[in-house]
């Protein structure tokens, strides 16, 4: 019996060693290279472009047929939460979209340093009113809440997401953007009542490559919802070809407003 157990343990350890070794193997050289401009454009043609208020969206490149992107995640309203009040902003210029491009309205929320840990009733009502107001523009059947809530507002954020889900009509799904490190903070993201979680894999700081490798291989320590089909990338800092291939539903951000600005870029919070 002891021999059987010892043999079984040996096989398990050997198998585990092979698995760990395989997980730690670097990607083949061709797949580890950053995606080229042509590969980014090809991905964008079948995916989603984030369009912020200072942009008119991606332009056609060359003689490509069809629209340069499939869906436009357009920031339609922004709300800055401050101590006891809400500041509203949003798009001030008209947006002309190519024929056939469907809109995903994005409600963007920011918390200033003096914002309370728990939202005031007026702040909560303002966010939910924006969600209801723009749900009718969701031609893609999806509305996105873009809110990088600080840790002190985590519980308020979870309650807000649940309320936003309730505020949407039955035919409109809810998407949320998340910071990459949120995906390593337990399973709280898996418990959100949302239809889509979009980890933003750009502006990752000095450990950017480590983060991207974790998403490349679908690290089991990442929250399950962070290993879904949607991933957020930036055109100026493209992912590896392997990571791009993993994203069945890429979202693309462009630091230069797609070189098609509608007004000077500006930040909501100085």
Description of each model-found segment:
Residues 1-9:
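Bacterial N-terminal signal peptides that target proteins for export
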Residues 2, 18-270:
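Secreted glycan hydrolases and related glycan-binding modules that recognize and/or cleave
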Residues 8-17:
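Bacterial N-terminal signal peptides
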């Amino acid at each position: 019996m002891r021999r059987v157990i010892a043999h079984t343990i040996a096989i398990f350890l050997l198998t585990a060693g092979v698995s760990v070794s395989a997980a730690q193997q670097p990607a083949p050289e061709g797949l580890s290279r950053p995606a080229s401009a042509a590969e980014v454009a090809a991905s964008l043609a079948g995916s989603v472009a984030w369009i912020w208020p200072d942009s008119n969206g991606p332009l056609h490149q060359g003689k490509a047929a069809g629209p340069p992107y499939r869906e436009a995640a357009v920031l339609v309203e922004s709300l800055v939460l401050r101590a006891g009040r809400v500041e509203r902003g949003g798009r001030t210029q008209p947006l002309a979209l190519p024929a056939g491009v469907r809109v995903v309205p994005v409600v963007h929320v920011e918390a200033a340093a003096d914002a309370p840990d728990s939202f005031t009733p007026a702040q909560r009502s303002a966010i939910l009113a924006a969600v209801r107001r723009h749900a009718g523009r969701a031609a893609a059947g999806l509305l996105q809440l873009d809110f990088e809530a600080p840790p002190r507002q985590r519980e308020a954020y979870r309650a807000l997401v649940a309320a936003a889900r309730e505020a949407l009509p039955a035919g409109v799904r809810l998407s949320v953007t998340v910071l990459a490190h949120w995906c390593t903070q337990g399973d709280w993201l898996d418990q959100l009542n949302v239809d889509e979680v979009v980890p933003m894999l750009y502006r990752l700081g000095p450990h950017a490559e480590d983060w991207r490798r974790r998403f490349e291989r679908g690290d089991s320590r990442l929250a399950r919802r962070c290993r879904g089909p949607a991933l957020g990338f930036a055109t100026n800092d493209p992912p590896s070809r392997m990571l791009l291939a993993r994203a069945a539903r890429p979202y693309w951000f462009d630091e230069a407003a797609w070189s098609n600005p509608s007004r000077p870029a500006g930040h909501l919070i100085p």
